[in-house]
Amino acid sequence: MARPVPIEKLRNIGIVAHIDAGKTTTTERILFYTGKTYKIGEVHEGAATMDWMEQEKERGITITSATTAAYWKGYQLNIIDTPGHVDFGVEVVRSMKALDGIVFVFSSVEAVQPQSEANWRWADKFGVPRIAFVNKMDRTGADFFKVYDDIIEKLGAKPVPIQVPIGSEENFEGIVDLFEMKAYIWRGDELGAKYDVTDDIPSDVLPVAEEWREKMIEAIVETDEELMEKYLEGEELSVEDLKKALRKATISRELVPMLCGSAFKNKGVQPLLDAVIDFLPSPVDVPPVKGVNPDTGEEEERHASDNEPFCALAFKVMADPYAGQLTYFRVYSGVIKAGDTILIANKNKKVRVGRILRMHANQREEITEVHAGDIAAAVGLDTVTGDTLSDPNHPIVLESMEFPEPVIAMAIEPKTKSDQEKLSQVLNKFMKEDPTFKVTVDPETNQTLIHGMGELHLEIMVDRMKREYGIEVNVGKPQVAYKETIKKKAVGEGKFIRQSGGRGQYGHAIIEIEPLAEKDYEFVDKIVGGVIPKEFIPAVDAGIQEAMQSGVVAGYPMIGVKATLFDGSFHEVDSSEIAFKIAGSMAFREAAKKANPVLLEPIMLVEVDTPEEYMGDVMGDLSKRRGKILGSEKKGTTMTIKAEVPLAEMFGYATDLRSLTQGRATFSMVFEKYEEVPKNIADEIAGAKAKAES
């Protein structure tokens, strides 16, 4: 089976935005104009093609990143639609690994919002080129140039408008293409499929277009010496040369082309598709992926070529009600065929590939092979998100994905005892699908706790248990995922001796612990002269890690600790792994109590949009919640207030904000950092936890 298109004509793109910026609507229009759907699905009607889970249709938000292939002017676009809601940010992170370029959708009214900032930082981290699409130009308060300023100020990027709008709010008619200096005007009612292209630019828009064309040319020539010389010598620059230079500068992430439109009103989407082709990279335009050969330990590269050994990344795993487990994978090099045996390289496990599907939201087309650069889904592979798939004869392990830690937990139990086993199978399935969803058992109360990125995240998981698997559960109140850490160095000694007839137990370890900023835990072995035999040292490490699961302040997991084992002793006959594990735990607990232990809590970055008259009340309320106000700014008719607030104080905030502002304010929050809890509150938390467990 040949490639559908040459690799140079392939674009793997993500569509990313803050919730409600109109991202799913934009994706729907793209699918309509590329001929993938015959009827436009509106989000507010619950009919959007990409939002295929029941809960998405009800809530009008995108939860899982559906992927679909579409075709435009001889190019294949693999589009990944990602959620804008903060609780599902993990979907954005994992799809970044599969992408070569991103369309960032911004609302022309709200401009750059918190989740967009968070996603932009992730795109920086993964080095993904992007273009900006300013949507909702038909809305009251629409301001294309305000978004331009915001992108510079908040994202530290260099946007380059390649269009300017013709009109705005209810008078928004179309755009001026600054390369060709032509007006694109959408008038008819053919769902935006037809539009006029004319040299006749409205007289009130012409001076604005001329000014911004000059700015566009200046920004582009600054990235290209040859063009700069021509420009300074007064030579006319061809559109082709300018576009070529902008493509290069977009791929190198020096510039961000900026476009505008109204997806809902069917205006501006076709030029956006042209820009995806013109400026975003194909798989051969991005650097090769790097990984480690597990046999040699050497770093190796894989280029986007069918002739190199097969290498792919499983970037998403989902349970499918009809096909079983689906593994979405991005092929970086080589070719994979249905029936091939491949290696899950990070687990050194061979598996046979059965059926391969090309996905369109939740519909599928069976294909026989996938080539370098392409994205597809395999049925029934035993993988988890982040696994590397490779040619068994040329193994390579790609860098694994990092995901944010869950910040909220909730106790659950099945309503009927008979569902207990089924529930644990389903929870395991969910953990495979979603790396930010975790399940633990509280050692004190024996309760099952589910952990996630926010209340909505956990609500949807509970809803899925009932809908997809018929399991009804009782849920407890949401709890904050507190952590503990230490603030100074301390030494601890653990000696475990048991004599009870026959063989005894003997383990003795002395450790020093100290604060560690850059990671959660590090173990250093400084034993000399064999005072503890080598085979028992991992047991001390395991004992320390076990003790860290239940800290000394209030029994929460400890983070940010470096532990150095430097002394101890052993007994020729009685020493054992279990004795040293217990000694390690004892030594850690003794040291931790002396190391100025403190409680940490998740701090959220909260952004509230409120009419001006409620501003004082909203700020006062945030301060009462131990919030630190970072600032406020006027956006159209509303004020935007930014604050850092402990998550513990934000439960039920949506209801309180509604009553405070008569339902006129909205808010969003993103996890920011862990911070020390004030002593008086830490004492209350520790007391409440001890009481609950007694």
Curated annotation (Swiss-Prot):
Q: Which GO terms describe its cellular component?
A: cytoplasm
Q: Which Gene3D superfamilies does the annotation name?
A: 3.30.230.10, 3.30.70.240, Elongation Factor G (Translational Gtpase), domain 3, P-loop containing nucleotide triphosphate hydrolases, Translation factors
The yes or no answer to whether the keyword Transit peptide is present is no
The record's SUPFAM superfamilies line, in alphabetical order, gives: EF-G C-terminal domain-like, P-loop containing nucleoside triphosphate hydrolases, Ribosomal protein S5 domain 2-like, Translation proteins
Keywords (A to Z) from UniProt: Cytoplasm, Elongation factor, GTP-binding, Nucleotide-binding, Protein biosynthesis
Residue span(s) of domain tr-type G: 8-284
Among the GO molecular function terms of this UniProt record, one is: GTP binding
Signal peptide positions are: none
Q: Indicate where this protein resides in the cell.
A: Cytoplasm
Q: Name the Gene Ontology biological process terms.
A: ribosome disassembly
Summarize where GTP binds, as residue positions: 17-24, 81-85, 135-138
Which InterPro entries does the record match to this protein?
EFG_II, EFG_III, EFG_III/V, EFG_IV, EFG_V, EFG_V-like, EFTu-like_2, G_TR_CS
Q: Which PANTHER family is this protein grouped with?
A: RIBOSOME-RELEASING FACTOR 2, MITOCHONDRIAL, TRANSLATION ELONGATION FACTOR G-RELATED
Summary of the function given for this chain in its UniProt record:
Catalyzes the GTP-dependent ribosomal translocation step during translation elongation. During this step, the ribosome changes from the pre-translocational (PRE) to the post-translocational (POST) state as the newly formed A-site-bound peptidyl-tRNA and P-site-bound deacylated tRNA move to the P and E sites, respectively. Catalyzes the coordinated movement of the two tRNA molecules, the mRNA and conformational changes in the ribosome.
Please report which protein family the annotation says this sequence is part of: Belongs to the TRAFAC class translation factor GTPase superfamily. Classic translation factor GTPase family. EF-G/EF-2 subfamily.
Protein name from the UniProt record: Elongation factor G
